[in-house]
C-alpha cells in the first residue's frame, strides 16, 4: 500500500513507550490508522486491484511511505472520502460506536455526558450520541474547545476547569451514560 495518510493515535504513543495492553515484537513501525492506494497485491488477492483507494483497520506500519497489510484488514474507500478522513475515521468512530451502541446501548432520551469531548474520540461520541437520540453534555477545557464541541452538536457545554462542574452537572438533571474519552479525575467525579 502506498500510504497517503496516517493518524497518530494515543495507542501509538503507548506502544512506543511499551505501556500498551499488547506489546508487539520488535522492531515494529507505528501507525495504526492508515489509508492509501494499493500499489501491489499478492497472488491470492481477488477483491482489490492496483490503484484502489483503501483504509486499513488495525495493526501497525502506517508511519512509512509503503506498507504491507493483510487483505482482511482493508476496505475500499467511498469516492467522496478523502485519505485524511479515512485514516482518522476508523479508531475514533469505532471506539465510540462500540462504547455507545453496544456497551451502553444508548437510546433516544438518554443523557450522555462526554468527558474530553473536544478530542477525536470525544467528538465522534457527540456525533453518534446525537444520532442515537441522546441529550449530550460535552465537557472540555477552555473556551476554544468548548466552541468546537458546541458546533459538533452538544446540547450543553461545560468547562472542565470550572470548580463548580459537579453542581452544574447536577443542575442539568440526571446522567444515564458517562463516556470518558481521556481518563483521569473527572471520571471519578462523574
Give the residues covered by each predicted segment.
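A structural motif shared across PLP-dependent enzymes of the aminotransferase-like
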Residues: 58-71
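Glycine-rich cofactor phosphate-binding loops and adjacent beta1-alpha1 units
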Residues: 137, 152-190
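Residue-level marker of beta-strand positions
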Residues: 5, 52-53, 66, 111, ...
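Cytochrome P450 core scaffold surrounding the K-helix E-X-X-R motif
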Residues: 11-17
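Short helix-loop-beta connector
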Residues: 49, 79-84, 105-111, 173
Amino acid at each position: 500500500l502506498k500510504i497517503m495518510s496516517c493518524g497518530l493515535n494515543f495507542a501509538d504513543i503507548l506502544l512506543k513507550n511499551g505501556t500498551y495492553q499488547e506489546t508487539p515484537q520488535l522492531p515494529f513501525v507505528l501507525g495504526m490508522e492508515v489509508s492509501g492506494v494499493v500499489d501491489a497485491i499478492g497472488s491470492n488477492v481477488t477483491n482489490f486491484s492496483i490503484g484502489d483507494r483503501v483504509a486499513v483497520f488495525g495493526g501497525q506500519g502506517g508511519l512509512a511511505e509503503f506498507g504491507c497489510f493483510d487483505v482482511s484488514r482493508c476496505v475500499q474507500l467511498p469516492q467522496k472520502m478523502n485519505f485524511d478522513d479515512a485514516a482518522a475515521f476508523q479508531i475514533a468512530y469505532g471506539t465510540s460506536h462500540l462504547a455507545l451502541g453496544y456497551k451502553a446501548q444508548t437510546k433516544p432520551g438518554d443523557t450522555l455526558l462526554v468527558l474530553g469531548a473536544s478530542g477525536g474520540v470525544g467528538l465522534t461520541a457527540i456525533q453518534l450520541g446525537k444520532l442515537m437520540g441522546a441529550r449530550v453534555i460535552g465537557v472540555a477545557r477552555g473556551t476554544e474547545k468548548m466552541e468546537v464541541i458546541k458546533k459538533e452538536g452538544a446540547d450543553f457545554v461545560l468547562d472542565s476547569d470550572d470548580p463548580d462542574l459537579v453542581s452544574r452537572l447536577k443542575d442539568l438533571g440526571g446522567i444515564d451514560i458517562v463516556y470518558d474519552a481521556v481518563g483521569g479525575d473527572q471520571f471519578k467525579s462523574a
